[in-house]
Amino acid sequence: MNTVKRSLLFFVIALSIVVNARQAQAQSGVELENVKADVQFGEQILFTATIKALIPIQGVSIMIVDESQALSRLEPLTVQSDGRTEFRLDTKKTILRPFTNVTWSYQVALNDGSTVQSDSFSVRYVDNRFNWQTLESGTLHVNWYNGDANFGQAALNAVQSGLQSTSRLMALDLASPIDVYIYASADDLRGTLFSGGEDWVAGHANPALGVVMVVVEPGAEQSITMEQRIPHELMHVMMYRSVGVGYNNIPAWLREGTATLAEVFPNADYDRILASAAAGNGLIPIKDLCASFPADAGTAFLAYAESRSFTKYLHDTYGSTGLLNLAAYYADGVECERGTERAFGVSLSNLEVNWRSSVLGQNAFLPALQNIAPYLVLLCLVLIIPLIGMVSARRKKGKPNEPETFVRKQ
């Protein structure tokens, strides 16, 4: 069952439960008071409520749902004599995406054998380690904690510039909110990422949530940094809204390539490191950038530079429509090396050869040889091993009385 069908089934079942539960709740006199969820980001969410009923309560469970991942868990609760309950969700062990919506409800089993399902409640898993300031424009929300009002306005300007840049590649979808969170240091941002993230990570997006997180330190370079990093992450959100839940099937080189093209002020070192790698025959094969980028900072930067240049080549050759068609094929599950064949009628390896030749001025023979090198090695093995056998047999045939060589044991 695919993700869309699973989510729809989940919604239908949940709606059915709530409708039936409201009728049962009214009949049984179950009441919930002081329902709260206290978030301690990176540590826990504490769910508390006081539950009372006209019929004695046999047991209570809490149903917690992570909407962004369509995951749920059902946990039994202890009910105190005064009806109080609490449950601590350890967010160090249970992975929650930053700023995701968490919903919860209560299932109350009564002594008469009936079960009552409460209404659902919701809390946002906000990074409350900081006191956020907020500036809004329509569905665009900019949040920061280090810097004055001018800093926030500069960030909002960067969002709008980034959307204008993105609109040259695809239609914008601003129907749902976009929340941009600006962190003052890489360490602060890494505190939001599941595994801490690499040291060089300066931005992250949760496209399904419409959440963008970037590192920008207040100072003379803040506007340039904003117009590099914010548009980059915004493109991830727009691409997700364009292709839907198949977004994660898109190769890393195309996701990051389109994101770097959206940067208003792209990093000037992209071209330098790309030219150096091309001259030294140190380019990363594009097929090696399908699943993910390298963890090493230097190699990762080269991966970004290559992806930007290769994606720009595709855009210049096939236009925005061609690029979006390619993304759509990938989102539908087409394999990395087959997607370009479906969209353009050309293999990924041949497109790479053309890109290296026309954009980087590299001899087309080198990448072609690199692509077929494993097959050449295999061919040599297939030919050489029988040849060695034939030579050995002819030598033995020419000297029939010569004894075989052996090593005497001492």
Tell what function each PLM region has.
Residues 131-247, 251, 292-293, 335-339:
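Juxtacatalytic substrate-recognition/specificity segment
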Residues 199-212, 224-229, 234-237, 241-372, ...:
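Acidic/His/Gly-enriched intrinsically disordered linker/tail segments
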Residues 364-409:
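C-terminal single-pass membrane-anchor helix
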Residues 10-18:
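Bacterial N-terminal signal peptides
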Residues 24-131:
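Glycan-association/targeting regions that enable binding to alpha-glucans and other polysaccharides
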Residues 4, 39, 45, 57, ...:
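Short, intrinsically disordered terminal tails adjacent to the first/last structured region
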Residues 1-9:
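Bacterial N-terminal signal peptides that target proteins for export
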